[in-house]
A protein has these predicted regions:
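Ubiquitin-like/PB1-type beta-grasp interaction modules and other compact soluble beta-rich domains
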Residues: 1-72
Length: 73
């Protein structure tokens, strides 16, 4: 299974952690497609703790983390 950890607004309606079958997604962009998250809304995308590109492949037992832009004042 691929573990997808969602942060901030991405959790709304999806929860904190989503699990995906590795047969259903082959790259980071496909993970976003399944979750219906537009790529332009992603500020940070990590695969196993490393900054990654949406073209990077994902495989069984990977842990992904997806962060939207965060602001504060």
């Amino acid at each position: 299974m691929i573990e997808v950890r969602l942060f901030a607004t991405f959790r709304e309606g999806r929860g904190k952690i989503v699990f995906m079958e590795p047969e259903k997604v082959s790259c980071a962009q496909e993970v976003l497609d399944v979750l219906e998250i537009p790529a332009e809304e992603v500020a940070i995308f990590l695969i196993n703790g490393f900054h990654s590109k949406l073209e990077d492949s994902v495989k069984d037992e990977d842990v992904l983390a997806i962060f939207p832009p965060v602001g504060g004042g």
